[in-house]
Amino acid sequence: MPSKLQFYSEFAERTARQITGSYRSWTAFLATAARLYKYPYNEQLMIYAQRPNATACAEYDFWKDRMGRYVQRGSTGIALIDTSGYQPRLRYVFDVADTAPRDAARSFTLWEMRAEHEAKVCSMLTEQYDVPQDGGIIAQFERVADKLALEYWTEQKRDICGIVADSFLNGYDEDNIRMAFKTAASTSITYALMARCGFSPDGYFEPEDFMPVFDFNTPAAVSVLGTAVSEISQRVLRQIEITVKRQERERRAERTEEHGEQPDLQDQRRISGPRPEPARESA
């Protein structure tokens, strides 16, 4: 009988083989990964496989000690494979939906990018990545994703070219591998940014936009692609988070100063329904 570690290792490998098998599978993974953007790819994969609708995950002690929340009876932890030590081991996290607040619990909210944040986010993206603002924020997301995907390829192309064996990339020359990787990564990053920032990427992209993703059809190949998408998305989303939260703090401070109101600690709401996005520009 396999150990739990072996069971979950094989489970992760099966999931990795499946997620690039179709447009729906890959974008479903991206939607989960976008919500859990602070986790690395391998842990995003495990969370997606066990709890695809998870929104915010943390270990038991974090919920109990830092947030003043308790894990509800009967909740099942999400198993993650921890490779940070000398030997792999399992650790478990719980989604916020598995928890409930104690009397002295800290307020728990997820940041949300709303229409009033877009101007500052656009300015931040221009400053950080030297991309123009014309065409709106979705066009900016695409430009940032294109730029960072190409930078990632330049830095990691030896490793990327080293995983083509047994995948549909096998037989491609370096230039075609570069094109496949850049397109797959850039499209996926843009999808993740849109999903986390409240837009509807499924209404923006066509399944054909993800065709290069399907070439990454082995665990090693999807790991390279997934790691790139995860690392780049995390970098950009952390900067967006900082920008949004800073604007909210400034707005609350102004309200308090002008009207003598107490800061609204609950103003950052959970993400509601996605906002409509601008029409996609034709090529």
Language-model region placement:
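N-terminal accessory/interface modules of nucleic-acid-binding and processing proteins
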Residues: 1-283
